[in-house]
Every structure is written in structure tokens, then in C-alpha cells.
């Protein structure tokens, strides 16, 4: 007990020191800014409406940049085998920015570790490694931007050349592995302040494809604040090129990052001021430009972090186990009704055709994961005797209302079907299996669904087809960010990998739907002929949905 109290006291002292250091950095930065502006005569009269409009534009670019970096954060977490609801990951990432101004990234790392542990039980060691890894990506991207813009400007000196070489070296596999091992070594003592978790499973971070994807996003993210700096600095009537602005911002940010200055305070600002003066922009205009871009980048990021820290303190973590009970009443409105109806018609028609072709007289079926019962009702309308089960009691209650007294719907899951063996001629599951927590659970689900099938019976598996990279990105990042059906923790099943889950033989495989759910109905009708053409073309395996049919021997 004494040891626990001592550990808790040490953590409280550490948090007080981090907050005090952040406050000291803010005061120092503000004092230095006021001092420079007062010496240059940059009073409120110089802060014209045009200046503030340029600041707003730069701040908007910063927000877009931070959104890209938050997506990169979630991508890296997933590569480190972390499954946390995407909204909780956003909260953890952005909340860390509130302590951006603490020395050596300590506040940012500590707060992210705390929030991710509270909202997703993510091991602290993993959060620390991922945080260090994303900062390495930042430095590499800034080095590339600095080096390439220096070449264009004819200013490739030792500093910019060294940054470019170091950035390119990070693409070497041996360097990546060494960097990851170093990050894991650094993470151990820091992580023990929060938990005694085992060594993080972060081996995939040093994979070449992971690094390439991270670098592409990092380059896009860091070009944007450079563009914001150009917008702020170019509004004083003095010509300054976009390439010069990108070079100045990337070089100054690299310097601030390498010396681990909190938020680059004093270091990055002084470097930016020197670059503007070298480009012929001096005096009040240069000082206000530096003040403006620092406010629009570090200031906006820190303020946004404060907002998300409040969100963390005021909202509970996502409760995945009760997720579908919580969203039962809002489930149907997540996808436009016209697209829901179109998919309902397509999927039930495909199943009817396969059943009539491959089953002689078998009409009894089970909808495993029936949701609100729309597919049960449609299959019964087509003449089949279909029951429904769902793990969510809230969804079952709504399904009973939609189906009426003719249907049998009850609580049950794909892992535990409340029926004896060989009860059904066919079983279907529609967009359910990707919600299971692990590949092992998915294998158990296949075994359980096959258990309740009669010999020769058919198992229909309808799933999202993430073979298409664009659709995988949409379903993995965009859809769970905008809708509450998925949470970003799904484990997608690919049709060509069914042997991973079961040895039941394949009877049929159909690909369908290319148009996104969010398209308005008039556009869907216009593009329907193109969609039908794609569904019957060699591009069909890259569709949005698929149906695989397996037979129980």
C-alpha cells in the first residue's frame, strides 16, 4: 500500500512539473514576442483585417494538417496491433497537443499514454513508441522538404544537405529497425510510470510499407503549414516565393525538433525571422509574420488540445461490448435509405438464386446477426422460413417490431447460436463477422454457424470487400469517423482468404456494388449502368461488397 501511495505521489509531482514547465514556456514565448514587437513598433495598428484573415487561412491549414497527422497516428497504432475505437484514438491524439509546450515531448507523450490507457486500455509502452515513431516521421518529412526546397533555391548548404541525407537514410531497412529498437528501449522507463506492460509489439512499424505510407502522409501534413506561412508572409506587399516559405518553415521546424525545444519556442521563431530577413522582408512585417504563423500553428494546436482534453474529462470511453444496444435507435439512419433498400434487394436476390440452384427443398434458414430484422422479413416474403438472432437486445426488440408476429427473433450470437446441431438448411450472416475481436473468434464463429447447418447446407457470408485500397481507407478511417455503426476496430475478412477461417468448400462467390453509400440518389441512378458494367467486368473483385457461399460436408 505504501509503495502504491509513493508511486501515486511521484506521478502527481511529475504532472505538476510538466504543467509548470508548459506554463513557463508559454510565458517565455509571449514575453519574447511582446519584446520583439515593441522594439519594432509592431503595435495594434499594424494588425490590419487583412492580417487576421491571413491568420485564419493559416490556422485552417494547420487544422487540416493536424487531421492528417491524427489519421497517421491511428494508422501507426493499428500497425502496432492496437485496436481502440477511432473516436477515442482521436481524443487521445489531440488531447496530447495541450501539453505540446513541455520539454522533450514529455507532456505530450505522458498525456497521450494516460488518455489511451483510460479510453482503450492501450499499453503505455506502445503509446510511447508510436509517439516517438511519429516524431521521427515528422523529422524525416521536414528534412525532405528542407533539402528539396534548398535544391530548388540553390541554397543546399551543409545544414540542409545533412537534413536531406538523414531523412533519406530512414528509408534504409537496417536504420528503420535500429530506430524502432531505440524507441522501444526509450519507452520502457517512461511507460513504467503508468503500467508494467510487457514490451510492445511494434515490429511492423519498421516495415517498409508502413514507413512509406507514414512518409506520404507526413509530407502532405508538413507542406500545409509552410503554405500557411507563405500566405501570412506574402501579404505585406513584398514578394516572397512559396518555395522560400516552405524552406523557411521546414528548416526552422527541423531545428526546433532536433534540439527538442518545447513547441520550437524561441528556436523556430528566431530561425524563421532570419529567413524572412534574408528574403528581404524585415522589420515589423517579418516579426508579425513569425508571430502570426506561430499563433496559427503552435497556438491553434495547443488550444485544440485543450478542447479535446476537456472532451476526454467529460465523456466516457466507447463501450464496444454494448455498442449496438447504444446505437439501436439511430442505426438505420447511418446509411441512406435508398442504398439500404438497394443492398437489401441485391443480397436477398443473390441468396434466393443460390438456394434454389443448390438446395432441393431446403427452406429453413437463420439470419445470424439480424440487426433490426429487415433481411429476415424480406427472406420470409420470398417464401423462406427464417429465424433471426442478434447479440444486441436493443436490436432484437426493434427486429421483433419490424417483423411482426410471424417471425422468430431472439438474443444470440454467432459465437453461441441457441439452436441444436443440424437445425437449418442455410445460414447467412451480413456484415457481422468483421465486428469480432480477433481472428480466433472469427474462426469460432464459422465453426458455430456450420454446426447448426444440416449436412449439405449452405453458409452465406456477406462482408465488406476491402481488397480495394480506397474502399479499405474509407471503411477503416472515414466511415467510422462520420458514422456510429463501425468504430474503427473491425477485422476485415477478404474473400480469397476464407481458408483462414474454415475448411468448408466454396460453392459460389459474388462481387457487387461500386457506388459509395453517400452518393445522392439521382447520381446513383445516373451511374447505375456503369456499376452493372463493373460488376460483370474483370474489376469485379474490387467491388465494395461480396457474398461467399460455403457448403457443410
Predicted feature descriptions by range:
Residues 489-505:
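Short alpha-helix
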Residues 428:
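A conserved beta-strand element that flanks and buttresses the S-adenosyl-L-methionine
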Residues 436-448:
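A short, conserved alpha-helix within the catalytic core of class I
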Residues 1-94, 151-257, 283-290, 296-318:
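Predominantly cytoplasmic-facing regulatory/coupling regions of multi-pass membrane proteins
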